[in-house]
Amino acid sequence: MSRRTERGPMAGRRGSRWPERRHGTPVLAPAVCRVQEVAPRESVAGDDRKEAAPRASCPARGLQLPAAPAALRLRSGCQDAAMAAAAVAAPEVLRECGCKGIRTCLICERQRGGDPPWQHSPQKTHRFIYYTDTGWAVGAEESDFEGWAFPFPGVTLIEDFVTREEEAEMVQLMDRDPWKLSQSGRRKQDYGPKVNFRKQKLKTASFRGLPSFSREVVRRMGLYPVLEDFRPVEQCNLDYCPERGSAIDPHLDDAWLWGERLVSLNLLSPTVLSMSREAPGSLLLCLAPSGFPEALVEGAVAPSRSVLCQEVEVAVPLPRRSLLVLTGAARHQWKHAIHRRHIEARRVSATFRELSADFGPGGRQQDLGRELLQISLSFQGRPT
């Protein structure tokens, strides 16, 4: 898995590669920071889009670190006209709630009164920031582990994967179909088979494939080595908005049906993916030396401190229009979540999932897997 941030077709050239240093800790500095450019395997045939103007950025563009080890917050920013037009939610979606069990949103919390359940759940005490260029998670500024780091493999980020125009068109097409109320203030659209994960059964009767507007997205994924053989059989669109208090709890995606790679396209606004692990044991840390981050990439510093896994949360900044790929430990061992505090404007995500080995060639369910792929890649789907 590459530790570098890959660049989408519309990427511009950037400035200095690394964040500024302050007392041994990387400080997010959008004006001087860049990510290493990794070109796709081949150019996009027939692509006549204009290249974006050069701009300075960093792996956590649009974010600021608090002085204390508190959660990352997003900077508010004005939205362009196209996005604003696409982002206006229908008024009626703010009057209903789809929460069940212990999960809540702002709508049902106001109706029920009292503190929301999540306020009483254990909070992670040590926060680290993931740096895409190194593949390491670094202790947040002025935290107990400021300047300490550990390797965090299995995350690939492709920035500017779609253009602003493509983003606006995709969201407009999504909004033409109905959104279903979901848990924790989200709305959703599913393109995939009906699945009972508990009984490990699925039905294909209502599945007509991925939506037509995803055909180009899936084709473009194949231009990158990490996704060159990626063939999704399911797409889940999720709609988040601050007015509903939208969020998603820490979770691991199923591994019976879904395969090695989870791929998610982040639209309309930046956010933060928060990753945590409940496993016992400790993480070994390295003290970032004066040569950070190159020394970390080379593995030149021996571990000299540890922290309990259960107390760690890793923040992975997701820029607007970026594509995230999770594999390996990041896919199977670290739970991922989107906290309510990291939704400051409407956000739409499109998550694509591939089949597990059981449904691939030589697997026990290879015939069913072949049928699912044929349906999926017809791109004639409507939300199920």
PLM feature spans:
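Generic low-complexity, intrinsically disordered segments
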Residues: 26-47, 51
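Compositionally biased, intrinsically disordered low-complexity segments enriched in Pro/Arg/Gln/His
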Residues: 13, 17-26, 49, 64-65
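Serine residues within intrinsically disordered or low-complexity segments
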Residues: 2, 16, 43, 54-57, ...
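Low-complexity, intrinsically disordered segments with a bias for serine/threonine
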Residues: 6-9, 20, 37, 47, ...
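Non-heme Fe(II) oxygenase metal-center motifs and adjacent flexible, charged/small-residue loops
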Residues: 3, 58-384
